[in-house]
């Protein structure tokens, strides 16, 4: 356990930051799941709308250091590829 007051404060801040980061990470995952769900249903328009929202949230996560830029780019690229194949197939 921390003995110095500054160390105690840092421990409190870490707990607070961890909760915020977990909430943001969970929100990003939820938006990604919404895109995947719309793709599985075959809704082109809804999938495109969900992707634009998810892309925005993912990039906000990058800005807040929740996920790394390459990870975000990979996720967006894979979702875009799935939507593109959905649009071409039907």
Swiss-Prot record:
Molecular functions per Gene Ontology: small ribosomal subunit rRNA binding; structural constituent of ribosome
Keyword entries, A-Z: Ribonucleoprotein, Ribosomal protein, RNA-binding, rRNA-binding
Biological process terms in GO annotation: translation
Gene Ontology cellular component terms for the protein in this record: small ribosomal subunit
Function: Binds directly to 16S ribosomal RNA.
Stated family: Belongs to the bacterial ribosomal protein bS20 family.
The name this protein goes by in its record: Small ribosomal subunit protein bS20
Protein species of origin: Rickettsia akari (strain Hartford)
């Amino acid at each position: 356990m921390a003995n110095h007051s500054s160390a105690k404060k840092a421990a409190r801040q870490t707990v607070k930051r961890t909760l915020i980061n977990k909430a943001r990470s969970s929100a990003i995952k939820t938006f990604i799941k919404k895109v995947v769900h719309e793709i599985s249903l075959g809704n082109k328009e809804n999938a495109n709308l969900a992707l634009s929202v998810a892309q925005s949230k993912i990039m906000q996560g990058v800005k807040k250091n929740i996920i790394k830029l390459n990870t975000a780019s990979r996720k967006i690229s894979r979702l875009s590829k799935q939507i593109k194949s959905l649009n071409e197939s039907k």
